[in-house]
A protein has these predicted regions:
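Short, conserved catalytic/metal-binding motifs centered on acidic residues
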Residues: 16, 90, 228
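PAPS-dependent sulfotransferase catalytic domain
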Residues: 41-87, 92-198
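General alpha-helical segment detector with a strong preference for membrane-spanning helices
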Residues: 18-20, 94, 232
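A generic hydrophobic-helix recognition signal that picks specific residues
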Residues: 7-9, 83, 221
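A generic structural motif
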Residues: 34-41, 95, 200-210
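PAPS-dependent sulfotransferases, especially Golgi type II membrane carbohydrate sulfotransferases
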Residues: 171-183, 187-188, 192-256
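PAPS-dependent sulfotransferase catalytic core
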Residues: 1-62, 98, 106
Length: 256
């Protein structure tokens, strides 16, 4: 049966999502992707502000793939039966990769970043996984919508428990959840679900050398990403439990 759903790839930064994004774009064709490459190029090779991406959704109703560094709550703007995809990465590794990204872009220096970690401060936004999955819908339009969403990715978290609970519930609602350390399984799952001929790729490697962090510095990264660590472990545990259930059902050993 032909797959005719639209796809939303909630691309959380530094999760190896660029490789999947490019594979999906190749499979559906550039003309069926929002935000378009033209709009991305207009913004210097970066995803455009949210309100511009949503406007392009309205202008291209025949799109097949919507992807970007946008919160999962943006799904409310998409058709009800949209297929949702998310990739999670070990939160400590993801945060360190984000720091290297900041260094490569010149947003900070290595000396300043390491000093921040030594002093117990994280030089990048904390708990990105929970922010993207558990962030509350923003009721605004136009540039205000984009500005408030941008703020939501870095401002202090007001209610950690509430954010974590929403992230867990959202994670359970994702149609296809993958993990950076098992990308082949994710590609296989997407291909099975959509029939799209995906090609494994390795794109957008870090442009900054690996960092050698002390135990103290690593502890700072962990401490500031406790919500993400809990979310990551919970999602992996549920994935493994579901895999075991499917295996038992196939072997006839499953009992309700």
């Amino acid at each position: 049966m032909k797959f005719d759903k639209k796809i939303f790839f909630c691309h959380i930064p530094k999760t190896a999502g660029t490789s999947l994004r490019l594979s999906l774009e190749q499979a559906v064709g550039d003309a069926a992707v929002v935000p378009s490459q033209a709009l991305i190029s207009h913004h210097g090779g970066r995803y455009p502000p949210l309100h511009e991406a949503l406007q392009e959704l309205q202008d291209k109703p025949d799109y097949r793939l919507f992807r970007g560094h946008y919160g999962f709550w943006v799904r409310k703007y998409l058709p009800r039966n949209t297929l949702t995809i998310v990739v999670l990465r070990d939160p400590v590794a993801r945060a360190i990769s984000h720091i290297r990204h900041f260094l490569a872009d010149g947003k900070t220096t290595e000396a300043d970043a390491l000093e921040s970690l030594d002093q117990g401060r994280l030089p990048v936004p904390d708990n990105a996984l929970c922010r993207y999955l558990g962030g509350a819908a923003i009721e605004a339009v136009g540039q205000e919508l984009s500005a408030r969403f941008l703020d939501s990715k870095s401002i202090p978290i007001v209610d950690h428990n509430d954010l974590f609970k929403r992230a867990i519930l959202t994670g359970r609602s994702v149609d296809i959840m993958g993990f950076t350390d098992d990308m082949p399984a994710l590609y296989e799952k997407i291909s099975q679900e959509t029939g799209l001929p995906l090609t494994m790729r390795q794109d957008n490697p870090s442009r900054y050398p690996a960092l050698s962090l002390s135990d103290r510095q690593l502890d700072t990264v962990r401490r500031h990403n406790q919500l993400d660590l809990q979310l990551y472990e919970a999602m992996r545990a549920e994935r493994n439990s579901n895999k075991l259930t499917r295996l038992l059902k196939r072997t006839g050993l499953y009992r309700t």
